[in-house]
């Protein structure tokens, strides 16, 4: 499987990452990526930037080191209502919105509460993908949530860092189940390194191996071509990005 998009990466702006967007783009180029989503942590995460930072991504060039740059965020799910920590006025400035649970923002609660939060954030229409949902601290009704994601064209991330065991220990078992059920349901999958240092960009081997284990069709893995990824954004109702015209 050839993956040409990394949909989950962080820069210095996240507060606990160690590279600039230029360094990330250079690493992406060296590793053969065509598109890179820059997705710093949203404001409620300790050390994260103000929402102006995300709005101001409109000044970023569409290409850095010949890699297309998608302007994104890793938003925090705040509550069972599925609210996220950016104002709706920010949506117009963002190409790619990940929604994730993080312990400092949403304290682990019950399976019912986690499920409600995920269903509601999907139904909000404000997010494109659920991030690192295999975290064992946040059990949820996998089948219900994935069915809802399918109905609303929200992708499910396979997070490589979760599978390494270096973060969110114990995620591998739940990630395996999520991919297994996701295949049955027919969701779209995406692959994210969750890089917090430029050398981790495009480190997706474990995510790819898990998708291959369940023989997920490449037309359901939106990071396997620029066309699949960009047309998924169109499916989500995002406008065409003119600078990427030749990549659709």
UniProtKB/Swiss-Prot annotation:
Q: What UniProt keywords are attached to this protein's entry?
A: Hydrolase, Metal-binding, Zinc
Annotated positions binding Zn(2+) 1? 8, 10, 74, 194
Annotated residues that bind Zn(2+) 3 are located at 74, 102, 132
Q: Where are the transmembrane segments?
A: none
Q: Name one GO biological process term.
A: bacterial-type flagellum-dependent swarming motility
Q: Write down the EC number.
A: 3.1.3.-
Tell me what this protein is called.
Probable phosphatase VF_A0065
């Amino acid at each position: 499987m050839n993956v040409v998009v990394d949909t989950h990466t962080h820069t210095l702006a996240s507060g606990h990452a160690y590279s600039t967007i230029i360094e990330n783009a250079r690493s992406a180029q060296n590793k053969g990526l065509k598109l890179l989503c820059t997705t710093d942590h949203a404001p409620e995460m300790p050390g994260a930037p103000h929402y102006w930072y995300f709005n101001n991504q409109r000044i970023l060039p569409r290409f850095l080191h010949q890699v297309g740059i998608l302007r994104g965020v890793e938003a925090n799910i705040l509550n069972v209502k599925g609210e996220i920590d950016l104002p709706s006025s920010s949506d117009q400035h963002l190409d790619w919105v990940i929604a994730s649970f993080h312990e400092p923002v949403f304290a682990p609660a019950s399976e019912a509460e986690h499920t409600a939060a995920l269903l509601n954030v999907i139904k909000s229409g404000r997010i494109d993908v659920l991030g690192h949902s295999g975290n064992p601290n946040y059990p949820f009704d996998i089948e219900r949530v994935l069915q809802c994601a399918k109905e609303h064209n929200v992708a499910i991330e396979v997070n490589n860092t979760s599978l390494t065991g270096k973060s969110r220990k114990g995620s591998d078992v739940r990630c395996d189940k999520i991919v297994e059920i996701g295949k049955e349901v027919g969701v779209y999958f995406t692959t994210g390194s969750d890089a917090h240092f430029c050398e981790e960009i495009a480190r997706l081997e474990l995510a790819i191996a898990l998708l291959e284990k369940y023989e997920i069709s490449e037309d359901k893995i939106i990071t396997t071509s620029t066309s699949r990824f960009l047309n998924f954004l169109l499916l989500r109702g995002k406008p065409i990005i003119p600078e990427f015209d030749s990549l659709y």
